[in-house]
Amino acid sequence: MCIFCKIINGDIPSKKVYEDEDILAILDISQATKGHTLVLPKKHFDNLLTISDAEYLKVMKKVKDLARVIVDAFDADGVNILNNCNEVAGQSVMHFHVHILPRYNKEELKIEFTDHSKECDLDSILATIKEKMAK
C-alpha cells in the first residue's frame, strides 16, 4: 500500500486541508512554498496516465477551488499547479496527485524550462502527435 493510501486510510497522520468521499487535500510536509498543498483522489491510480477521466475531473475541480482559497489566504502573487508523472518527471509517490504551489515575489523556488528549439523540428513533432491522435 502506498504512503498516500495509508494517509487516506488514517494509518499515517496528515494535515488535512479538505476531505470528501472522493478527494483528500493535505499540506505537503516539505512546504516548498507557504501553503504548498497536495490534492489526491482517494481511489488509487498510479499517475496521470492511469487515472479515470471522472476521477481526474473531480480532482482538478477541487484543485481550482483550493488554489483560489490558498492564494487568497496567504496573499500569494501567483500559483503553480503541478503534476509529476512517473519517476523521470519527479514523481516520488506512485499515487496520482496534484501540487498547489502558491508563489510569492520574493522566493527562491524556480521552475524553469530550457530552450531546445534549435534541436527540434517542430513540424515533425507536430506530425507525430497528430498521427498518434488519429489512431
Residue ranges and their predicted role:
Residues M1-K135:
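HIT superfamily nucleotide-processing domains
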